[in-house]
From Swiss-Prot:
Its EC number is 2.1.1.182. The gene is rsmA. SUPFAM superfamilies: S-adenosyl-L-methionine-dependent methyltransferases (SSF53335). CDD domains: AdoMet_MTases. It is an enzyme of class 2 (transferase). This is Ribosomal RNA small subunit methyltransferase A. Keywords: Cytoplasm, Methyltransferase, RNA-binding, rRNA processing, S-adenosyl-L-methionine, Transferase. The lineage of its organism: Bacteria, Pseudomonadati, Pseudomonadota, Alphaproteobacteria, Rickettsiales.
Length: 262
């Protein structure tokens, strides 16, 4: 399809286009009802996912794309869906989505893999603005997002996302659905935002705890937490947390208790 449009994917933008509407329809269906929601799509590419979204009749769709070569394709879609679709030529990392759309909002996207994690970390800062995210990630990143304690993939991302939402891996996809084919597997995940965080916690302090512990994840927390807490052993004992544990063994609640003790 990109050959027909004379648009060749740029490696520096992590462009891997999905040309099959069967696949994009399936991804959009994972988002559930969208007719009562405004939708944001990041990296719409050749518009296959864009059409899948618009065909499910959202209140409104805004797509954000950095590659100006794709503008003519999306101008045609704008004209076709008069008033329903808006195309913004910009870098999504530089946009506060709260300034361009009104809630309720869902994000549906095949994210460019090189900015997928930075985008998600940015959106976490105002996650209560959104209802849900249905996102295609590199499988390795998706596995980190949904990982539970005592799993090698359990990470800072796991804790921060799951503190604020319910996460579900919907489906894994092979490289063959993309053009060009990446060298990795991909996964679609659903992130359903909770009405409030699972536990009350100071998010700045939690981030500090996560950084010092996962920064040296093979070390026991009694060692790494000394960078933040003087009387580490006493505090961990008072919280009934084994000081010989490593960060991948701690629950989200335990991380929050430690953060609240600083």
């Amino acid at each position: 399809m990109y050959h027909v449009n004379r648009i060749y994917p740029k490696k520096e933008l992590s462009q891997c286009f999905i040309s099959s509407s069967h696949i994009t329809d399936k991804i959009v269906n994972y988002a559930g009802n969208i007719s009562d929601y405004s939708i944001i799509e990041i990296g719409p590419g050749l518009g296959t996912m864009t059409y899948s979204i618009l065909n499910k009749n959202p209140k409104r769709l805004i797509s954000i794309e950095k590659d100006s070569r794709l503008m003519p394709i999306h101008k045609k879609i704008v004209d076709e869906f008069n008033g329903k679709y808006e195309f913004i030529l910009s870098d999504a990392l530089n946009i506060d989505l709260r300034t361009i759309i009104e809630p309720p909002v869902k994000i549906i996207a095949n994210l460019p893999y090189h900015i997928a994690t930075p985008l998600l970390m940015k959106w976490i800062n105002y996650i209560d603005f959104f209802t849900s995210f249905t996102l295609m990630f590199q499988k390795e990143v998706a596995d980190r997002i949904v990982a539970q304690p005592n799993n090698k993939n359990y990470s800072i991302l796991s804790v921060l996302i799951q503190l604020l939402s319910n996460v579900y891996k919907m489906e894994d996809f092979g490289p063959e659905i993309f053009s060009p084919q990446p060298k990795v597997m991909s996964s679609v995940i659903n992130i359903i935002v909770l009405p409030k965080p699972r536990f009350n916690v100071n998010h700045n302090k939690l981030s500090q705890v996560l950084k010092v512990t996962f920064g040296e994840r093979r070390k026991m927390i009694r060692s790494t937490l000394k960078k933040l807490i003087n009387n580490t052993d006493e505090i961990l004992q008072s919280l009934n947390i084994n000081n010989n544990l490593r960060p991948e063994n701690l629950s989200i609640e335990q991380f929050c208790k430690i953060a609240n003790s600083i």
